Amino acid sequence: MAALSLYFLVFSGPSPRLHIVPYTKGGNTVKQGSAKDTKNNQHDEKPLSSTRPEDVALKPDPGHHHEEPTGTRAGWEIDIDDLTYWSDPDDPETNDDVLPGYETDGTPREAGDVARLQHEKDLRKMWRYAYKTTAKLANSNLVYGNTLNQLIQKDNRTEEQSKCLREDPNVKFKFNDDQPVRFNPYPDYNGDEWKKNGHGPYVPCKGPTGEFVEDLLVFRGRPARWPQTKFGGYDLFGIDPNLCWERDSRLGQYGLQEMKKKVGGSYKPIDWDNVNWGELQKHCLKQNAARFDMTMSKKNPYLNNYTENHQKATRSEYIKTEAPKIKGRSIGAKQGQITKESRTALLLRSYTGMKYTDNDRQVIRALVSELSLKTGGQYEVFLLVHSKNQSLPIFDDDELYQTVLKDNVPAEFHGMTVLWSDHQVWDVYPALTDEYARAVHSAQWLSVQKFSQDHPQFDHIWNWEMDFRYTGHHYDLLEKLSAFAKKQPRKYLWERNERYYIPEYHGDYDTSFREDVAKKRGNKTVWGPPDLPFVKPVGPKPPVASHEEDNYEWGVGEEADFISVGPIFDPVDSQWIISNHVWGYSDENHKSTDLPRRTTIVTQSRISKRLLDIMHVENLRGQHVASEMTAQTVALLHGLKTVFAPHPVFMDRDWKGGFLNNWFNPGPDGESGGRGSPFGWGRERRFQGTTWYYRAEPPNRLYNNWMGWVDTNIGGIDWEKKHGRPCLPSVMLHPIKNTQPTKPGHKSEFELAIG
């Protein structure tokens, strides 16, 4: 089978000689060399190719793809004709339901119909083949089973990263010979640099033990078998890749281990139900009030952006408008003058009826401690809880509000919880009349917008999903993401945002990747907002008329209005299932579906008050797009800065960079959106083996094992006695479901409606 070996050569390292086990439709094994040919019934097996991996990964498409015209496909490295007699016994899809034609033949089709085209079915089969037949390779599944016993590169870090670590002779763990060190990623509060920059005095805050919050513990080194990143990288953010986090040292002080508090003359175990995290945060902020602008005006500066004349504003009128000044952003300060620091709210998105596991509670405690208490109030953590029962008038009855709160939120978090309901936000946005448009699935930002209008003291808000876990330090992560976004130039930024950054394929982020994007996009770039008669942009004016006059300078040092942790792609023609969910944004010359828009899968993101303010105004007008598109699209329309921060993403297969680029950035200019997008209906199985997506297998498996729970024959007490205590580098994991001890034989599964 000619191409059966070709795709294997997309793996890193030496070309493997493989024992390939194809399957027939009945699930029976076909011996190698006996696959049948349609003309001769059988043919001799062709020899493995001697082509180098790097050549194959980058070579043009060698395959045939059933009616898809030349020039509209990426190179897939697998020839579908060679898979005629291979089938996956776990694949319920048949060839009975096939529509004629191809995606680019001009026939209007819904996403579900595109998925029924033969070309799409072929792609799904090719990916299943690639993923299935590599499961047992020596360089597959290296993300699993890593422990403290395997650590290497323990002292390999920059001088700046070394400053964050300190020995603690009082710490002893019996499960490992090496002992962890303290990790402190915070500024040198009240030091010379702190004072030089004009900051107010920092006051340390106490936690639930009655003592100052202690720095986290972490082990130096990384597991020897742990793979390299496939998307993104640590070096982009300055995050230390050679640290390994173990569960007891990471979550012990948040309740995974018994914590004690001094009561009278003795220490007693903490009763977490008697802790009030809301009060702890408020008291901490009060102690540090001099550092922050506590009296920010509640006025939204854009409420009068659209008068009858403004709606007819031309682009020339727009570019004369200055962006509103944001207080407290000066780098230094005059002697005796305090530079006010910005504040960020973190909203944990929850709902009534959610059952909080012990792990959920430990992670929430970690967020409050690391982001709010340790920073003296720079961050504040809230539970934003959707009261789903629309018949309960909780805002008309204080007693009912408290009842709903007590019945649905652990006592320790009552003081940091904000309830909201559908009717509450619908009353704010009466122009949104379509029932589907204003439902929480399509309009999850409405509650965040209302929160921002009610709490204007926050310059930024993190929209935080409850099924997200970060094994590393939360403050280290958020500050590094923010700093990365701030230094990004606007030139070709939207175009960099719309693709996965694959280090092995793209090279250095700030040089070769940037140059590659510029070469592929040329003049097809976003430079300021689109010219639309029904949108009056509020963002800053480009400093020069054309991107060609800018040397990657505009935007450097500018805070991002939106930070995503996934590509910000163009959903048009992507076959993403809700790409056309647009309401309003039209006139007699523009259909709603003609609106330029962008989206990101998974809404974990940071958003500025400026962007939330104009989103609020657009929704007041009845202009709306689906949740995953909302912030990105409004930012595009208003000329605001958005950044995709390519955090490290790992995979359970050692795919070559060129292979990954073909499957995950298949657009004509190397983007992840548009035709062939991996986010399209029926294509998302490609994410099965990644550590970050809205459906993926490794996140739950890794987290279960890390917590000491059995999953897919790894983890648990007996396994750890033999192999050691699991540890993980700093890695973002999503989705994480059902964070509680598993039963023997448990296996996390990956399910899709199609694919």
Regions found by a protein language model. Name each.
Residues 1-38, 43-56, 60-69, 78-81, ...:
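N-terminal signal-anchor transmembrane helix specifying type II single-pass membrane topology
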Residues 5, 146-147, 151-346, 350, ...:
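Long, contiguous juxta-domain segments that are non-catalytic but functionally important
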Residues 8, 20-23, 473, 479-485, ...:
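Catalytic core and acceptor-binding pocket of nucleotide-sugar-dependent glycosyltransferases
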Residues 356-370, 398-402, 442-446, 477-478, ...:
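Well-ordered, non-membrane alpha-helical segments in soluble/globular domains
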Residues 380-388:
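Short internal beta-strands
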Residues 390-457, 475, 482-505:
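Active-site-proximal specificity loops/subdomain of glycosyltransferases
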Residues 457-467:
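Short beta-strand-to-loop acidic/aromatic patch adjacent to the donor-nucleotide binding site
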Residues 675-755:
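Terminal low-complexity segments of carbohydrate-biosynthetic enzymes
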